[in-house]
Amino acid sequence: MSPEALSELIFNIANTLVSEGKAGTLTADLIPPQAKFAVMRPKDRAHGDWASNAAMQLAKKAGMKPRDLAELFAAELTNADGIKSVEVAGPGFINITLDSASAAAVVDTVLEAGSDYGKNDHLSGKTLNLEFVSANPTGPIHIGGTRWAAVGDSMARVLEANGAKVVREYYFNDHGEQINRFAKSLVAAAHGEETPIDGYKGAYIDEIAKRVIDEANADGVDVLSLPRVDGGADQDGNPLGEGDSEQREEFRKRAVPMMFDEIQRSMKNFRVNFDVWFHENSLYSDGEVDQAIADLRARGDIFEKDGATWFESTKHGDDKDRVIIKSDGNYAYFAADIAYYRNKRHRETNPADVAIYMLGADHHGYIGRMMAMCEAFGDKPGENMQILIGQLVNVMKDGKAVRMSKRAGNVVTIDDLTDAIGVDASRYSLARTDYNSPVDIDLNLLSSHSNENPVYYVQYAHARSCNVDRNAAAAGITYEGADVSLLDTTADGEVLAALAQWPALLREAGDLRAPHRVAHYLEDLAATYHKWYNVERVVPMELTDPEARGEQADAIRIAKAPEPARAAARLKLNDAVKTVIAEGLDLLGVTAPDKM
């Protein structure tokens, strides 16, 4: 019997007690939803397999003492199939012990569902637009963007496991001043000049500049001989200033697609596949910025002051109104944000019911204006728009901060990280910490084969379970027809309980937008499995060296051979663990090796 089944049973008992007039002043409309009747694993196993505080939740509404109400629940629970015993403890806790068959039923449930175990459809019918990374195309993706890549894609997978339709989206900032500075930096590098004060540095700038020159030469264009004088306008219609004219535009139009290709390559190598690559410049070229402003104007949220056009965001909870068209006629950056949200909600293909923005810590000040804009369009902040703010990443090696990249200068890039520790360790280590908290990435630890390395510890549990399968096959042991009720030891019970908690954990991770909970669960399951493996054998091993210690002993230790029926049941439990670990790792975009 799973925790969810127990919650449902307790919910039904509450309604039964009301209908029979045994629950004092409690009425059916005062009973909370089933999900509110949480069933917990007691810290002290002497208190049973599961515990509920339902009586304490309802006692005040019933006008009864919690223990008295708990006794009524206990009497009903005792008669339920699969429950061995029930005890009321303390102020009104209900401690429940399952019979062995009921506790072990989760094994069959896992193996029948396979990689779908725990997945549900409670978010079905909703399209969630999840925008993440969205780094400027002015250089390689840095470590902060790398964290969002790991967290964002893992979050998307978790949401999909809960039935949501997820659109993974990357907003490509190919319009505005940062692109101008990027192009200026390339021109300076091409001429061997110093980087502009507000420009971009790093070996990649020299690389891109050379690629632009080579590509232009192949097209018959001598880019270095193009004018570098005043005159004309850039692709955004802005006047070209000194050092900004035709030559800079040639570098710009060739270099931005190069960076776009590099970013796409990095994301693919990191196992992140976006559904939409949205170009900011299209909002201007397609007239969507003007349409969005006109829409807000029609709603009474636009006014003119000091020669500029303003969004009256204070009407919707912002701390001040926002300029969207400056007095010089140029658009403020926020104008594109307005148009982009409107596009997400009303596009023809997969319009978003919920637009989720994953932003860096430096964007915290954007929340007020974004939520105000959402409300101005008639939507519900927090429901139709959700903003997640991530914190900083510190990369450490030999106890010291790593701040330099061979290619990108003073930042650590996605390729730097994956070259150092691989994609698996990179994704896992970045996703396992709540994005609301800073995270330290210890390169020494994450490249080690030790139990202190969390990704190694979890992957090793999967590899170990695969090895058990191979040894069992060699010994002729199968679990066909196995009686899981024989899984009745303390170690068995711990593994069974861990497996039973996966569906609720997965649902919670989706509702809370918290993929790090998946990683924490996997680490707990791996620890429980490793302990089980050390005390419960499936296949006996011969002792070839009585003096063996440590890892060597783990491979050759002798164990009493279990009877065939119990060996089969343990093999079945082993495979259930293997299934759930593989599923959890996949949700984090991490491989589940069968050998290590």
From Swiss-Prot:
Its EC number is 6.1.1.19. One of its GO terms (biological process) is arginyl-tRNA aminoacylation. One of its GO terms (cellular component) is cytoplasm. Residues 227-249 are annotated as: Disordered. The keyword Transferase does not apply. A motif ('HIGH' region) lies at residues 135-145. It comes from the Bacteria. GO terms for molecular function: arginine-tRNA ligase activity; ATP binding. It catalyses: tRNA(Arg) + L-arginine + ATP = L-arginyl-tRNA(Arg) + AMP + diphosphate. Pfam families: Arg_tRNA_synt_N (PF03485), DALR_1 (PF05746), tRNA-synt_1d (PF00750). It is an enzyme of class 6 (ligase). Keywords: Aminoacyl-tRNA synthetase, ATP-binding, Cytoplasm, Ligase, Nucleotide-binding, Protein biosynthesis. It is found in: Cytoplasm. The keyword Cytoplasm applies. Monomer. Belongs to the class-I aminoacyl-tRNA synthetase family. PANTHER family: ARGININE--TRNA LIGASE, CYTOPLASMIC (PTHR11956:SF5), ARGINYL-TRNA SYNTHETASE (PTHR11956). This is Arginine--tRNA ligase. The lineage of its organism: Bacteria, Bacillati, Actinomycetota, Actinomycetes, Bifidobacteriales. The gene is argS.
